[in-house]
Amino acid sequence: MVATTVELPLQQKADAAQTVTGPLPFGNSLLKEFVLDPAYRNLNHGSFGTIPSAIQQKLRSYQTAAEARPCPFLRYQTPVLLDESRAAVANLLKVPVETVVFVANATMGVNTVLRNIVWSADGKDEILYFDTIYGACGKTIDYVIEDKRGIVSSRCIPLIYPAEDDDVVAAFRDAIKKSREEGKRPRLAVIDVVSSMPGVRFPFEDIVKICKEEEIISCVDGAQGIGMVDLKITETDPDFLISNCHKWLFTPRGCAVFYVPVRNQHLIRSTLPTSHGFVPQVGNRFNPLVPAGNKSAFVSNFEFVGTVDNSPFFCVKDAIKWREEVLGGEERIMEYMTKLAREGGQKVAEILGTRVLENSTGTLIRCAMVNIALPFVVGEDPKAPVKLTEKEEKDVEGLYEIPHEEANMAFKWMYNVLQDEFNTFVPMTFHRRRFWARLSAQVYLEMSDFEWAGKTLKELCERVAKGEYKESA
């Protein structure tokens, strides 16, 4: 039986919600197109994203169709809708459609890669990663090492920001050299497109190139990627790349595109969890799914991964279309967000009397996120002293200090106050004893939002300096 696209319940209503003529001007006037609470100022788009009302209507239409006729929809219509979104995202990324499938999030994609790789039995394989790796992916590496009982190990590459791209490249080459000198085999590298904390653009293109030269598998964690930066997959040609669509592409949570070039698809034998598409090496179990026709085993494997709601995946094509028709396309969107992040971050730094996290070549803010130093530092940890550089020592001068043992208490207090009193959220971290706040630019924000953020953070920091965070302990 060949499934064909059918008109879905609520489809006309959803289409009507997308009839806005564009491109619309960016800034706060665009907020009416989104489902955000008017009382909430979303300065942290990078963590979970959000969606336009038009895409929410699309999501509901797919869910309604699934409930109206469960078996026909899940068995026959789902593969068609997945193919439509796969075609749309492949066109956006300029890659062959047979190289892309969907998973729930980037963490699942990284897990899928690391748990499918067959590690060498001689125990020499190493996984390389930077110390700015996303926490869940770092723990995935830890799990794989435990699960494989010693046949694979890891090597963490420390970075000191604001690092130059050349410094990152040099650190990676040095890690490869040390690995081999110690009798190890650098087998796979996990590489960010934009790291989480701090939120900075990473020279992933250069690192992938080195991986090719050194015959190391490149696994690119583009959790912060599609919809924010040009991934240039065709030029970069990574071995694996995963990018969350629900963060910057305006698709519902959770949804990520998983890119695997044909040359590597044989390495990904199982989805997570293993489902009907798995082909065992021994035996032949019954597969109850509708035959996939001329699709590859890789694509067929990811069409049904247990009974889950795939509606966010179906919305990818709708989100791409909405961004083109209403917002004017990817280039216009990215240009606005990057400019706002750079200029808005500088404004916040001026209000706080600090600085943004940027290197001398200006490569860290080639994205929609910016990190601003807060006007205090964390006291030295006697168990793990950090030797600051001359530049860092100068930055510390004249700032007040939070004792190391009170840092987490201050973090928790600041988060609670931002949420409860200011109706916003700003992720913060400390790197090299310095507190940093990460802000996300987006098309529905403008400079006034960053000015507000600067004043809010200034008030918050003044209250921290007075020790107010201790009162809630």
Swiss-Prot record:
GO terms for molecular function: hercynylcysteine sulfoxide lyase activity (ergothioneine-forming). Catalyzes the conversion of hercynylcysteine sulfoxide to ergothioneine (EGT) by cleaving the cysteine residue at the sulfur atom, the last step in the biosynthesis pathway of ergothioneine. Ergothioneine is an unusual thio-histidine betaine amino acid that acts as an antioxidant against peroxide in conidia and contributes to conidial longevity. It comes from Neurospora crassa (strain ATCC 24698 / 74-OR23-1A / CBS 708.71 / DSM 1257 / FGSC 987). It is an enzyme of class 4 (lyase). It catalyses: S-(hercyn-2-yl)-L-cysteine S-oxide + AH2 + H(+) = ergothioneine + pyruvate + A + NH4(+). The modification N6-(pyridoxal phosphate)lysine is found at residue 247. It holds the Pfam family Aminotran_5. Keywords: Cytoplasm, Lyase, Nucleus, Pyridoxal phosphate. The keyword Lyase applies. GO terms for cellular component: cytoplasm; nucleus. Coiled coil: none annotated. Ergothioneine (EGT) exhibits antioxidant, anti-inflammatory and cytoprotective properties, leading to its growing application in the pharmaceutical and cosmetic industries. Also shows UV and gamma radiation protection activities. Finally it acts as a cation chelator and a regulator of glycolytic metabolism. This is Hercynylcysteine sulfoxide lyase. Its cofactor is pyridoxal 5'-phosphate. Belongs to the class-V pyridoxal-phosphate-dependent aminotransferase family. EgtE subfamily. The lineage of its organism: Eukaryota, Fungi, Dikarya, Ascomycota, Pezizomycotina. It is found in: Cytoplasm; Nucleus. S-(hercyn-2-yl)-L-cysteine S-oxide binds at residues 47, 438. Pathway: Amino-acid biosynthesis; ergothioneine biosynthesis. Its EC number is 4.4.1.-.
